[in-house]
Swiss-Prot record:
It comes from Staphylococcus aureus (strain MRSA252). Belongs to the binding-protein-dependent transport system permease family. OppBC subfamily. Keywords: Cell membrane, Ion transport, Membrane, Nickel, Nickel transport, Transmembrane, Transmembrane helix, Transport. The lineage of its organism: Bacteria, Bacillati, Bacillota, Bacilli, Bacillales. Pfam families: BPD_transp_1. This is Nickel import system permease protein NikC. The gene is nikC. SUPFAM superfamilies: MetI-like. Residues 69-258 form the ABC transmembrane type-1 domain.
Length: 276
């Protein structure tokens, strides 16, 4: 048991260090260098001046990856915020109000989750002009369902507990019950799901950009860089390997962090149940 939580603490440290490094590096690179074309320096090899070399337009690859992190992570955070707001709100009302609202939401979720997520995202993104902002809409439309289902499940388990019954008996406003009493109960589980989904959403954004439905040139974004590097996989593989490696490492870190948070949450719930 001690080894498990020691491992989890190490994961949390790596996660924090990764976020810290990504933030600090933003201050050492210029966004202008990520988009400025310099045809006299195309395909420069790896050096102290260009840590990962340059691309076919003479742009520094390391700079583009760091600036691309800003685009990818910002859109991911924005998407998660939209997903959580919609999903948790619907889940709270569906779990509390019951009746036709709950049935309608559940039937919609059953239909939505019966279709592969990525297929729906591609279909939705195809209706819009390719951009990162449209990816936010396309991903949010399908991903909120998991949060609604999780929230409703937790609310259902809390509804028969004495503190909720007492609040209803004393005619406490529904808004107060939802915000002050039920919302704190769902926050830990929602945070775990958010961290796990963070890696998934990065993968979705990168994949949609890779097939031309997301970020467009010259915007530095990891998926768009993969698409660009695909054409030079034989002659200059670093253009493909660099963004692919960053995507893989980022997803791995967030997935491991999500697993560690889930372990800690389950441990806390176990201790709570034993004490009650």
């Amino acid at each position: 048991m001690h080894k498990i939580f020691s491992k989890n603490n190490l994961i949390f440290f790596v996660f924090g260090a990764f976020i810290f490094v990504m933030i600090v590096l933003q201050f050492f690179v210029s966004s202008e260098n990520a988009t400025k074309v310099n045809l006299s320096q195309t395909f420069e090899p790896i050096s102290w001046l260009h840590l990962l070399g340059t691309d076919d337009y003479g742009r520094d690859l390391f700079t583009r990856i760091i600036i691309g992190a800003r685009s990818t992570l910002f859109v991911t955070v924005l998407t998660l915020i939209a997903i959580v707001v919609i999903g948790v709100t619907l889940g709270l009302f569906a779990g509390y109000k019951k009746g036709w609202i709950e049935r309608l939401v559940l039937r919609f979720i059953d239909v939505g989750l019966s279709i592969p997520e990525f297929i729906i995202m591609i279909a939705l993104a195809s209706f819009f002009q390719p951009s990162l902002w449209n990816l936010v809409i396309s991903i949010t439309v399908i991903k909120w369902m998991n949060y609604t289902r999780l929230t409703r499940s937790i609310v259902n388990s809390e509804m028969n507990k004495p503190y909720i019954k007492m609040a209803q008996l004393f005619h406490v406003p529904i808004r107060t019950i939802l915000i002050r009493h039920l919302t704190p109960k769902i926050i830990p589980a929602i945070i775990v799901l958010m961290v796990v989904d963070f890696g998934k959403i990065i993968l979705y954004i990168s994949s949609l950009s890779f097939i031309g439905l997301g970020a467009q040139p010259p915007t530095p974004e990891w998926g768009a860089m993969l698409q660009q590097g695909r054409d030079f996989i034989s002659s200059h593989p670093i253009m493909l390997i660099a963004p692919a490696s960053v995507i893989a490492i980022t997803i791995l870190i967030f997935n491991l962090t999500g697993d560690a948070l889930r372990d800690r949450l389950l441990k806390q719930r176990g201790e709570y149940n034993e004490s009650h």
